[in-house]
């Protein structure tokens, strides 16, 4: 384990001087054999310093462990003891892994890996196609539990959330670990899902703490001890540092956060350029401290990897239409509208093209999103046809989101009628399944392929 130093850089043997308190009697605490000021009991961790520091924020980050895998296992208990790989779209060699069980991760498999590569690493793995409605249902159940503990709950994604405990110093003067333990147990009891929880003075520290605590762990990093905690991390663990960036910096001799902490910003800029300022701030533990309870998601999107490379625009438009309908349906389910439509095409040479268009008004209607998506597709596909390139992946996203009620106040009559028709279609699909209502253009394409 990497060394955690105190706020003044003192060595670990002096750690007892830094501790403000212990959560449990000393006899109950198992000190880590490695150096540092981490104390563990049943996978609880506390990182704290001796200096009296006023806590400006107390944020919890709740991260559900192997969420997509565990939701599938709840509905299919026979998958409990197998190396399980959940795929979002295709289950053949052209698809990608959406989530891997912890057993499968031991073979080096991770989210986003092509299925063909995952099969080579773990031939005995079982593949399962996930269900977005099931994920959404489980995520909403978790959110309901979290709202019992804090009035400010921000779902960063389906499987992670931030909770604001600012101003609770008198209620919880020593530590928030007991609260985190109660949250973890309540989530497990209510939903059957495990989670890890990180606590920190800002969002970044809280998230990195939950990452360090996985699986089913708890970690608290006190204000004033951010740098000591971060010093033990690799740069690749930091937000905004992807694999390619980490590899490029490693070639320059930068692999660990403590190296960045010790460099002045000018010297760092000479090595990595314009990223120096932001990286330096993160390495010193600076991060956002505010949460907005009603923060909207950034986008709603769907994409699919095709079973074969396609060059027929009618086939591609049919697939795009279905993806658009799925996106529009999700917007309506979540009470959202969006203004910006983005098309994504990946060609058979793996070149990715995106096109976007911003509408005058936000919408959640299939037809309005489809009209923009089709125009974008025709622009992008003309270029692909000119280069004689097939398409292996197609996707659609809607961004620039807002609350649907705000857009309905001055809706024209013809648009209101389209909304009523859409609501009727939604009811049929809810009762009989999405494919119960299929446009004629899609059916014609299917008949032609027979």
Residue ranges and their predicted role:
Residues 4, 8, 16, 21, ...:
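Intrinsic-disorder-associated, low-complexity terminal segments enriched in Asp/Asn/His/Tyr and depleted
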Residues 361-450:
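Acidic, metal-coordinating catalytic segment for phosphate/diphosphate chemistry
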Residues 54, 61, 167, 230, ...:
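DNA-contacting surface of Y-family translesion DNA polymerases
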């Amino acid at each position: 384990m990497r060394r955690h130093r105190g706020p003044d850089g003192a060595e670990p043997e002096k750690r007892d001087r830094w501790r403000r308190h212990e959560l449990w009697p000393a006899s109950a605490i198992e000190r880590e054999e490695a150096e540092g000021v981490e104390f563990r009991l049943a996978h609880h961790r506390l990182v704290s310093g001796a200096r009296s520091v006023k806590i400006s924020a107390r944020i919890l980050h709740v991260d559900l462990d192997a969420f997509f895998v565990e939701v599938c296992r709840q509905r299919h208990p026979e998958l409990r003891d197998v190396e399980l790989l959940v795929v979002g779209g295709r289950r053949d060699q052209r698809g990608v892994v959406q989530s891997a069980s912890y057993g499968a991760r031991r073979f080096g498999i991770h989210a986003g890996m092509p299925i063909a590569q995952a099969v080579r690493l773990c031939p005995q793995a079982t593949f399962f196609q996930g269900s977005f409605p099931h994920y959404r249902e489980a995520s909403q159940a978790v959110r309901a539990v979290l709202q019992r503990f804090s009035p400010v709950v921000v779902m960063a994604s389906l499987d992670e959330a931030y909770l604001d405990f600012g101003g609770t110093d008198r209620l919880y003067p020593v530590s928030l670990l007991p609260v985190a333990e109660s949250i973890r147990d309540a989530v497990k009891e209510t939903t059957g899902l495990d989670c890890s929880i990180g606590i920190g003075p800002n969002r970044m520290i809280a998230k990195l703490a939950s990452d360090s605590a996985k699986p089913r762990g708890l970690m608290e990093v006190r204000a004033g001890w951010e740098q000591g905690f971060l010093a033990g991390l690799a740069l690749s663990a930091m937000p905004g540092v992807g694999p390619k960036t980490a590899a490029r910096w490693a070639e320059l001799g930068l692999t660990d956060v403590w190296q960045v902490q010790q460099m002045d910003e000018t010297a760092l800029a000479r090595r990595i350029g314009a990223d120096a300022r932001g990286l330096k701030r993160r390495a010193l533990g600076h991060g956002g401290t505010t949460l907005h309870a009603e923060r909207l998601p950034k986008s709603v999107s769907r994409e699919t990897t095709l079973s074969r490379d396609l060059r027929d625009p009618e086939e591609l438009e049919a697939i795009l239409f279905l993806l658009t309908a799925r996106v529009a349906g999700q917007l309506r389910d979540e009470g959202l509208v969006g203004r910006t439509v983005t098309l994504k095409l990946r060609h058979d040479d793996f070149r990715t093209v995106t096109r976007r268009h911003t509408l005058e008004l936000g919408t959640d209607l299939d037809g309005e999103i489809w009209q923009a998506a089709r125009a974008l597709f025709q622009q992008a596909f003309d270029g692909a046809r000119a280069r004689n390139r097939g398409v292996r992946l197609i996707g659609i996203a809607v961004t620039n989101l807002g609350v649907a009620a705000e857009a309905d106040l001055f809706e024209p009559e013809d648009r209101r009628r389209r909304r009523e028709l859409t609501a009727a279609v939604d009811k049929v699909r809810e009762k009989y399944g999405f494919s119960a209502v299929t446009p004629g253009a899609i059916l014609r394409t299917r008949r032609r392929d027979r």
